[in-house]
Regions:
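Large intracellular
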Residues: 19-163, 235-288
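N-terminal start-of-chain detector that recognizes signal peptides
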Residues: 1, 62, 71, 220-221
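Helix-termination/interfacial motifs at the ends of transmembrane alpha-helices
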Residues: 5-8, 12-27, 145-148, 152-232
């Protein structure tokens, strides 16, 4: 919602101010299609050159994430803590043998299937199961496990940030591409140097539309979208760190309740359930 409001404000203020200042939209309307084809087409081509197919798909998905916002909400954080509580409690009370059935086939696990949204995220499931699998193989050094988890998180986060970096790269190039379009317009104008001043003025005005479009697209649309996507990715990345915090706390010998409380402390403030809310969720999950 807010990105759409922001776009409306950007367009309204820029073009509304131009209109109130007595600007003539005919020049913009007449020149914009060709200028946009040159600038937008060149920017798209540069994006294709600098990315492989997976990268381009990521950029496409990233644009939709700009509009939809972070993937994980307050309930999802609560569900994640409840899931980790049940798994660590099972491991603590019944041992690794009872846990193996859940981590080897999470799609058939009664515990995992309580949380369908979490199960749809392959990284969440794989990250939890792979780490617990390491624990069942007697890798119980908290520092080694934490180091291994941190490397997985860094790799995943680096890959997740690629669409934002690609969009930012496009934004950085748009002003220069706008200048390219403007220069081509000036070249065209110089070929008609014998025309009367009013004709030359119109042609120069059309050429400058290219500079305007390049800067406007860069700083009014694409750049802010890249910043928003970066913020969304960073916020979603906090979700996966909760898994690390809870499982490392469990390896340090803490009870399941204490481990998830440590994880709750790492939840972003706007998403953080209260102690009472989490306790109620854990009780409900255990009884289910």
């Amino acid at each position: 919602m807010f990105p759409i409001i922001g776009l409306v404000v950007v367009f309204g203020m820029v073009f509304g101010g131009f209109m109130l200042a007595g600007g003539h939209f005919e020049v913009l309307i007449e020149a914009a299609p060709m200028e946009f084809m040159m600038i937008g087409g060149a920017a798209l081509g540069a994006l294709i050159i600098s990315n492989d197919l997976n990268g381009l798909k990521g950029v496409g998905g990233g644009v939709s994430r700009v509009m939809s916002g972070p993937k994980w909400g307050k309930k999802d954080y609560q569900d994640l803590l409840s899931l980790l509580f049940q798994l660590t409690k099972l491991m603590k009370t019944k041992g690794v043998v009872a846990l193996e059935a859940h981590i080897e086939k999470p799609n058939e696990s009664a515990i995992f299937q309580k949380y369908p949204k979490l199960c749809k995220d392959h990284f969440v499931v794989d990250f939890i199961c792979d780490t617990l699998r390491m624990m069942t193989m007697n890798l119980d050094d908290p520092h080694q496990v934490e180091d291994a988890m941190e490397k997985q998180l860094e790799k995943h986060h680096h890959e997740a940030l690629h669409p934002a970096h690609a969009l930012q790269g496009m934004a950085d190039g748009l002003p220069a591409l706008g200048i390219v379009a403007a220069v081509l317009g000036i070249v065209k104008t110089m070929g008609a140097i014998n025309e009367p001043p009013e004709v030359l003025g119109l042609m120069i005005g059309k050429a400058l539309v290219g500079t305007f479009l390049g800067v406007f697209l860069a700083y009014g649309i694409v750049g802010p979208m890249a910043s928003r996507l970066n913020a969304v990715t960073e916020q979603d990345g906090q979700f996966y760190k909760i898994i690390r915090d809870v499982l490392v706390a469990h390896l340090h010998g803490n009870a399941a309740q204490v481990s998830v409380e440590i994880g709750r402390g790492s939840v972003p403030s706007v998403m953080q359930p209260t102690f009472a809310q989490l306790e109620e969720a854990l009780t409900t999950a255990t009884e289910a």
